[in-house]
From Swiss-Prot:
The gene coding this protein: pyrB
InterPro entries given in the database record: Asp/Orn_carbamoyltranf_P-bd, Asp/Orn_carbamoylTrfase, Asp/Orn_carbamoylTrfase_sf, Asp_carbamoyltransf, Asp_carbamoyltransf_Asp/Orn-bd
Function: Catalyzes the condensation of carbamoyl phosphate and aspartate to form carbamoyl aspartate and inorganic phosphate, the committed step in the de novo pyrimidine nucleotide biosynthesis pathway.
Pathway(s) of this molecule: Pyrimidine metabolism; UMP biosynthesis via de novo pathway; (S)-dihydroorotate from bicarbonate: step 2/3
UniProt organism field: Heliobacterium modesticaldum (strain ATCC 51547 / Ice1)
Taxon lineage: Bacteria, Bacillati, Bacillota, Clostridia, Eubacteriales
Biological process, per Gene Ontology: 'de novo' pyrimidine nucleobase biosynthetic process; 'de novo' UMP biosynthetic process; amino acid metabolic process
Protein name: Aspartate carbamoyltransferase catalytic subunit
Length: 312
């Protein structure tokens, strides 16, 4: 099976077989990362531009390494050091990159829908690296990959997403991906940080952490996105940690083989305790490694690849 879309803008609307294609392709990519010489000629001669209008460490570096491991020419553009500061529009920036022969544009933007707008106006393939509070599809995919790698399956699992769901594009991509793959999804957080419209997606919504964790196979912990919040959504950070922070005692309500995820960056002692973040049942560093593999798979498939040809 080959990738049938020009762009990857979100997980909402992707078929189960399309998600499986990406996850299956990521496995041999992870083998490449484990080699002493992390280089294959798969995308030699192809150009990838990472266009980031928001700060990023993990996602931007992950995409850059993913391209370089497959021999693509990878360029990073920070909006603060580009013509954006001179008033250039997103569409004009995209057309400029098109004119330079760019094959793939990886974009992160504060405005929901920005990657969709860009994709309509450029010939280059577009990958959404996070748009506002809308979606973060590659993070969702790497979370799915990590769960499947640890648990052996996705279907039938109970996954609790805990924290600031209202402002989280990661939560939305996880919801769509997990639901498509047959998992039960629970959301938990203060009522002020739980968007009511997500209840219609078929997920279960909780405001008591003890109920949300009962029998969970996986807990995906979200950080408080204070940079996106208005005041008054919860009393204090200390109070939030007391009511919704994930600690060892609360984890006793989960399955004995529970898996803990966190998309990073972590606020230790707020949404997650140190002894949880550093435990063997947490796969937080694995998520970072798997992120490179999943993004390699996406870039490879979007450039027409299929099968295991990328590993040679």
């Amino acid at each position: 099976m080959a990738w049938q879309h020009k762009d990857l803008l979100g997980l909402r609307g992707l078929a189960k077989q399309e998600i499986e294609l990406i996850l299956d392709t990521a496995a041999p990519m992870k083998d490449i990362i484990g080699r002493d010489i992390k280089k294959v000629p798969t995308l030699r001669g192809k150009s990838i531009v990472c266009l980031f209008y928001e700060a990023s460490t993990r996602t931007r570096t992950s995409f850059e390494l993913a391209g370089k491991f497959m021999s693509a020419d990878t360029v990073n553009i920070a909006a603060a050091s580009s013509s954006v500061v001179k008033g250039e529009s997103l569409i004009d920036t995209g057309k400029t990159l098109d004119a330079m022969g760019t094959d793939i544009i990886v974009i992160r933007h504060a405005a929901s829908g920005a990657p969709h707008l860009l994709a309509k106006h450029v010939k280059a393939r577009v990958v959404n690296a996070g748009d506002g509070a809308h979606e973060h599809p590659t993070q969702g995919l790497l979370d799915l990959y990590t769960i499947k790698e640890r648990k052996g399956r996705l279907e039938g699992l109970t996954v609790t997403i805990l924290g600031d769901v209202l402002h989280s594009r990661v939560a939305r991509s996880n919801i769509w991906g997990l639901r498509t793959m047959g998992a039960e999804v629970r959301l938990c957080g203060p009522s002020t940080l739980l968007p009511p419209e997500l209840a219609i997606t078929g997920v279960k919504v909780f405001t008591r952490i003890e109920e949300a964790l009962e029998g969970a196979d996986v807990v995906n912990v979200l950080r408080l996105q204070l940079e996106r919040q208005k005041k008054g959504l919860f009393p204090t950070i200390r109070e939030y940690a007391r009511q919704f922070g994930l600690n060892q005692e609360r984890l006793k309500r989960c399955k004995s083989d529970v898996l803990v995820l966190h998309p990073g960056p972590m606020n230790r002692g707020v949404e997650i305790a140190d002894d949880v973040a550093d435990a063997d049942f947490a796969a937080i560093e694995e998520q970072v490694t798997n992120g490179v593999a999943v993004r390699m798979a996406i870039l490879y498939l979007m450039m027409g690849g299929s099968g295991s040809g990328a590993v040679h």
